[in-house]
Amino acid sequence: LFKQKNGRILQALYNGEDAWTGDRSRDDLYFCWNVNFRNGNDLAQTDRIFRASGRMRDKWDEVHWSDGTTYGQRTLARSYNKR
């Protein structure tokens, strides 16, 4: 993951830095999108990687939508790569 062209950015994001857009939510999405792109859209694995990263925070498991969806669930769904 970190040996790609954008590997330095992804490493910084994994470490919890806001290294791409400066917006935590956008950086979360960008990070998840890149992980999904490389793992064949294994959302469970992406969730585990995110939780192990410095990006993890309480917001990930908080409900943010009226349908009961958490921030993490919505971010993972939005990061799914259509091929």
Segments the model singles out, each with a brief description of its role:
Residues 1-83:
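Modules that initiate DNA replication and primer synthesis
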